[in-house]
Amino acid sequence: MNYTPYSSPAPGLTISPTMDPVTWVYFSVTFLAMATCVCGIVGNSMVIWLLSFHRVQRSPFCTYVLNLAVADLLFLLCMASLLSLETGPLLTASTSARVYEGMKRIKYFAYTAGLSLLTAISTQRCLSVLFPIWYKCHRPQHLSGVVCGVLWALALLMNFLASFFCVQFWHPDKYQCFKVDMVFNSLILGIFMPVMVLTSAIIFIRMRKNSLLQRRQPRRLYVVILTSVLVFLTCSLPLGINWFLLYWVELPQAVRLLYVCSSRFSSSLSSSANPVIYFLVGSQKSHRLQESLGAVLGRALQDEPEGRETPSTCTNDGV
């Protein structure tokens, strides 16, 4: 994750008619990633606007979804900035290096926050499935807000320490940087992702069991969570293991270049996908064009089985 202080994967590359095929692929995927970032920025901004300023039907997971949208938006803004710095001489070399490093730090902060928030969503949904009585009657009222605050603080602390040991302007000790990266990436890949996979598997098994026994469609919230987790694991995992490949595996420069740009595109796609998932799951075929976006989003996050959806207007904290 932090293998060089100013780790542009394609130093000195410029667009020209004489570019080799690898460079053409790099710039093509990069521009595709930038277009994806723009779409994702619009989509996540819309989700934040609807959950913050519109009175929509909400589930107890509206706080998590709002925070996840903020993390995705921040990630996409930083990714778009990094790609812009790499593909165009927008700043002087020294200023560009500092801006690039700052954007990279914020990007990984947002990535860590998004991963931990999605893990919290699947874990809390799993607890509600395994212990429904406790979840309904004894769960602390402001649990969602507290958990989100703790996860943001943890992500900030992790990335502050990584920045302190890995940024050349502060503490350019590569050995210390390596150890810090090993600890933090082991935490991400050894705890967060396994917990996300395990809890999602439990949700999927319970969803399938209920669907077969009761012969009705699964709750939309189940579909939203499972789809979001699947997209994250499929598209964002390459960025999560980026550090491992760059540290331990000797790859040709062309392969490294293609892997980095493809992992950036897939992670941008992952952060842009959640708004699409919400609106696809929440929409009804017969009223797809007539309903407001707030109603569609509220239905996607409604914590009620099909056929029992009732309006609820919880606040972001009182969940």
UniProtKB/Swiss-Prot annotation:
GO terms for molecular function: G protein-coupled peptide receptor activity; G protein-coupled receptor activity. Keywords: Cell membrane, G-protein coupled receptor, Membrane, Receptor, Transducer, Transmembrane, Transmembrane helix. Co-expressed in the small diameter neurons with P2X3 and VR1 in dorsal root ganglia. Residues 52-64, 114-144, 206-220, 282-319 are cytoplasmic. Belongs to the G-protein coupled receptor 1 family. Mas subfamily. PANTHER family: MAS-RELATED G-PROTEIN COUPLED RECEPTOR, MAS-RELATED G-PROTEIN COUPLED RECEPTOR MEMBER D. This is Mas-related G-protein coupled receptor member D.
